[in-house]
Amino acid sequence: VAQVQYQEQLTGCENDERFFNDKTIKYIPIPYLLNRYPSYGLNYYQQRPPALINNQFLPFSFYAKPMAVRSPAQILQWQVPLNAVSAKPCQAPPTTMARRPRPHLSFMAIPPKKDQDKTDTPTINTIVTVEPTTTPTTESIVNTVATLEASSESIASAPETTTVQVTSAEV
């Protein structure tokens, strides 16, 4: 029984029967549009209706047979609008743009990368041979020598100071 119902649904989808009749489309009468909206003007070569049923600003809608000015080859190329409601349950409902739900901020936490720790820290050789460094030290040696000069003026005992810098390398 289930297979028979499934096959009936498939045949209904293949026939592509619509909820509405393709030959009857709602149109707004042209004289109403000309009186209401004079910007349209007189158009003797009306190829498409200026306002369809979905126009929310026009209060009246009437059933009328569509007037096709195009050739039958072009009429076959016309496509069925995407917002047409289907009567069969096997056909998908019309798709609409749905907003994605925003996740809570607790889901937005980003864990730190494990590879990032390895790349940020440079590899340092911890085993380093210690080399003795020599630091030069300067010592000042002061020699005080009292020289007595015999002169005819006055004898002044002034000690002379000389500074000698000695550098030695200590480890």
UniProtKB/Swiss-Prot annotation:
Q: Where in the cell is it found?
A: Secreted
**Glycan attachment positions:** 123, 133, 135, 138, 144, 151, 167
- Keywords, sorted A to Z: Glycoprotein, Milk protein, Phosphoprotein, Secreted, Signal
Tissue expression, as annotated, is: Mammary gland specific. Secreted in milk.
Site (Cleavage) found at 107-108
Which residues, renumbered to this chain, carry the PTM Phosphothreonine?
147
GO BP field:
lactation; protein stabilization
Main location per the UniProt record: secreted
Q: Which residues carry this modification: Phosphoserine?
A: 151, 168
Give any Gene Ontology cellular component.
Answer: extracellular space
Show the InterPro entries listed in the entry: Casein_kappa (IPR000117)
Q: Where is the signal peptide?
A: 1-2
Q: What does this protein do?
A: Kappa-casein stabilizes micelle formation, preventing casein precipitation in milk.
Which family is this sequence assigned to? Answer: Belongs to the kappa-casein family.
The identity of this protein, by name, is: Kappa-casein
What organism is this sequence from? Answer: Tragulus javanicus
